Amino acid sequence: MHPLIHDWNTTDTPRPATVLLDDETLRDGLQSPSVRCPTIDEKLEILHLIDRLGIETADLGLPGAGPHVVRDVERLAREIADERLRVEANCAARTMIADIRPIAEISQRAGLPIECCTFIGSSPLRQYAEGWTLDQLLRLTEEAVTFAIGEGLRVMYVTEDTTRADPDTLRALYATAIRAGATRVCISDTVGHATPHGAAAVVRFIASVVDECGGGVGIDWHGHRDRDFAIINTLAALEAGATRLHGSAIGIGERVGNTPMELLLVNLVLMGYLDRDLSALVEYCETVSAATHVPIPVNYPVVGRDAFRTATGVHAAAVIKAFKKNDLALVDAVYSGVPAGLIGREQQIDVGPMSGKSNVVFWLERHGYAATDDLVDRIFSKAKASSTVLTSDEIVAEVRATGSG
């Protein structure tokens, strides 16, 4: 952060002792109704980018969905083992032995430890809709966790719709899973119901249940974007005691998606909770976008085309003055809350109807053209008459028309 910034975000909140990340792009991310399922080669490329970003675990898929998922999950698991990637693997499974067994078999064939993320609905809404009783849920929980442990799998026990479930049900379910051997539990805001206050409250409650069971069990947070609270809820969950946070590239996932991993990473770094090289972040997002056919909006934070781009005269003038001071940190701070350099990008000055002449001069000089008065006036007049920002080709055409190119 630039030394001239007074950071009102600084608080007395203790820095979290543990901040781990779990990437859901290749599982929950692909449950979006609009995505194209990537090829195995594309999945491998995404896996390597997850590893380059230092993300601790990646959900490789739900093998219980069928042979095609088993095939891809095993190939991904072998890639981690053969290439000695740092990222650890987990897989989703319903609380059914039929879902858990293929995970154990893949783990054994690939020679790679795989965490089993076995999930079950928990809210009264889901119980009523499905015709379940709590006794049934407890029995399924105990059987599933016990079987997975017996097969040599580490278990994260996941309750769906945790943020709309009652305390007594949650206590019973989590206590059963922990007694059966689960080493992590996951709180899921499955339909994006939670507010930051609610996210923190449910995490603190589950932490108390973990303590009642003897402690030593990690807490995950899995958020969704339905009310557009995913990032702030995830940060609230972290500060309340969650130690592993879930997300997916460009927020893809069920309905409107999951917590966007790239935005979570940027915020964790800017808050001082992580020290991480984010130079692969743009490639990570663009690769997932291309593989899934989910476009990145131009105004998407951090990785969108317009994230560090301005054609407004006042804004551009301040950035240009910072450039002239040869202070790149100032350039990245004067009109940006996220330093472009953090992710390997830079500030971009364009020319449009809201621009001043300094935009034109700066653009020309940055592109190796002499900013003569006649040329500047010509481009400036064209920009003022335009309804959009001028393209590079339009500006170069004006340069050539004056014989300056």
Predicted regions, residues:
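Conserved active-site and cofactor/substrate-binding residues in soluble primary-metabolism enzymes
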Residues: 38-41, 45, 67-71, 98, ...
